[in-house]
Amino acid sequence: LALTIYLQFLSPNALLTQGQALPHPTVFANALFMAGDNTPTPMMVQYLGLKAKAGDCLLFYRMGDFFELFFDDARAAAATLDIALTSRGEHDGKPIPMCGVPVHAAEGYLARLIKAGHRVAIAEQTESPDQAKARVGKTLVTRDIVRFVTAGTLTEDSLLDSWASNMLVAVAPVGEFFGIAAADISTGYFELVTVTGGALEAELARLSASELVVPDGFAELPGAILRPRADFDSVVGGDVLRQHFALNTLDSIGPITRAEQAAAGGLISYLAHAGQGKMPFLKLPVRREVHEHLLIDQATRDSLEINSASKGGRTGSLLAEVDRTITGAGARQLAADLAAPLMDKAKIDARLSLVQWFHDAPLTRDAVRAALRQLPDIARALGRVVAGRGSPRDLGQIRDGLDAARALRERLGAMADRPELLDQLLPALDGHGHIVDLLARALVTSPPTDTTQGGYIAEGYDAALDMLRVAGRDGRQAIAQLEARYRDMTGISALKIRHNAVLGYFVEVPAKHGDALMAAGTGFTHRQTMAGAVRFNSPELHEEAVRITQAGGHALAAEAAHLEELMALILSRRDPIATSADALARIDVSAALAERAAQSNWCRPNFVAHPCLEIEGGRHPVVESALAKSGDRFIANDCKLSPEKRLWLVSGPNMGGKSTFLRQNALIVLLAQAGSYVPATSARLGLVDRLFSRVGASDNLARGRSTFMVEMVETAAILAQATERSFVILDEVGRGTSTYDGLAIAWAVVEGIHETNRCRCLFATHYHELTRLADSLDALSLHHVRAKEYKGDLVLLHELADGPADRSYGIAVAKLAGLPPQVVARASAVLAKLEKGRVETGGLAAGLGDLPLFSAAIDAAEAKVDALREKLTDLDIDALSPRAALDLLYELKRAAGET
């Protein structure tokens, strides 16, 4: 019944084909859909059963040397991979779409499919054709799904970015809390955290998940993979954790919450499903608390371009500008540091002290960075080994990495005045001498990835293996001698002994000499006739071929056995090896930050207890670097926020540098709490618990939000979440609507930040009227970016000065941008009239200075000239008699009631 339903689901009208057949054998595909009476063949039944198991994943169905895809999977894959869509067999009289990729090149195709958002199920042959034939009455090779390849479960180098972590994240709602379990299985990193709804978005933004898994029915995170709710049961999750890590109690992890147990259970269950029973490497999970790091929501990350630029990609981001790491592990650690700056002053200072140690010792720094260049990616090689996807090359990388770590340990251990953090890291680089020495003896210098051809176990490691190899070499030498003898014997100089996977060894002669060797008594047996050649066998050749094959087979088996032993050794030492990889990454990051600081004369920030932000000579690292490439100099500016003056209102012309000033101070805070030097002459600050940026605007049409709506949503989040220890930058709040509405909103937001949130804030605006708030808000300070006009042209100085801007220079900026002269002239005339009207009537600013804090909006009716007011205005009180006055009073009261 299920098969019938599935076949009906595959609409015949939709099965259209195009393109040419791929150049590979078609016998398997023809066998799949060959029944003329529309009855599915056994192979079709097998395929459809596996497809049902694969669900919404594309099914890579192994057929010989190719992975084949059929029906809708074929159409989707062909479109994504830009490969030919062909057809094999029929269903309901219509050709069935098919495409395929070679097994040996599958990783490249998988990478493109995963990047396009697909998930792939790999169905491999689980027995050989000979094994299938040995089963009575069955010749169909058994296949099964051996792995699901998804964005969050990748371990192969070709499918991963070496500089970026690859996070799989599971979220479990339990009561009012959300448990988050996050893992990078390529390195074994595993963390748990519990958050409330208000911090969920910021935590997910920090983790930047490649794949998100949630329980079925949880609709708050669109795009997440839905998994059975039973996988997210907190009791089951606790049992799963204990079983996976062989723990008697979860106390060794820490005070783990029910929400974290539920999320961990969901994540581990998904990994078991993806690996079809083969579990990847997971370290014992690290418990995190939300208050341990600076909270940054997604809007702020996008605005500040922390890990990626606004146009996508790494170029132009803060990470790209700061990153001077040598190793992939170091690059990933730096990205993690910038994504989650610390809130612990002691830990920040420990990082800064190590950076300073490298900064102040350039020769040591250069030597360490040179040593790091010899390091392979130990963490990811270890991850593949633990996941059962390791190769001899991975073992070689672990060997070389641990050997380099040992040498680095000796060098750094001999240095004087080491900082405390370095002393904590160095012991992790020791203790692997036995592994390094064993792998050095066992493996060749550059082991291959492919094991099918052997050659990765070094000579001298196993005497028996060496003898098998000698036998194979002797056999090949004997065949070369046999070839020379056959040439002399037959007189055919073009005779050759060749080898292929189908025939093995054979004698080949040009077609014109074929008859001579076919004659009786020659000792040759005909094997194959080609267009231009004839192939033969001989008893002597067969005997040598058997010897070579047997020796080669035994040698491959011996190498495989040694490889398994070496893999088991690495598995037994996986935790200390992973710890070494982490230590090397931290050393790389520290030396890299020191290098970056030395390149641009950055300074070490100083943290104090009270909430201040005192920056002298602050610069925007990305903008400064871009200007330097064109030979221009960045204008540094100071910022001094204190409890007494914690809110700066910054005005001035467009292009004057307001947004850059705002962003550079936010980036300085972020870098400082990440443990980095900062682009400034000096920096003194109190810890920031939340960082908010409302700079720039864009539509979110997919979610039905205009530019102004996006601005208001982000501003609302800031007003709701910012605390007294937060740092907020706001740029042009209210510009997306009418002048009156925008000014009113900006006015109220400034008051709210000042009176309710009471946080450190930089607020840039073009509303000159806001400067009147300085008269009523004690902690507000006025500043502006300087500009001047010279011979009719605007000169932007990019310097910050005290006090409000005298005017906005908007028309001058428009002229600078190239607006037509007649448009600029007309704008100047209109502006003159508007400013004259404002002077005469009080205009836009009339009465604003008298507004009390948080006053209710003035009723729109009061702004209108109504009938009641007109009547009172026209009234001549002296001309009224007492009776007329009384009647008028009743009339006015009645009119007021109707109003």
Ranges and model annotations:
Residues T26-D360, D377-G383, A387, T445, ...:
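Basic, polar low-complexity surface loops/patches
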Residues F66-S87, G179, Y189-E191, E211, ...:
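A conserved P-loop NTPase coupling/switch region
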Residues F71-D72, T257, I326, A336, ...:
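ATPase nucleotide-binding head domains, primarily ABC-like/P-loop NTPase cores
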Residues V171, I180, A262, G266-I268, ...:
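SMC-family hinge/dimerization module
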Residues E211-V213, G266-L295, T300, S310-K311, ...:
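Structured, non-catalytic alpha/beta "coupling" segments that mediate domain-domain communication
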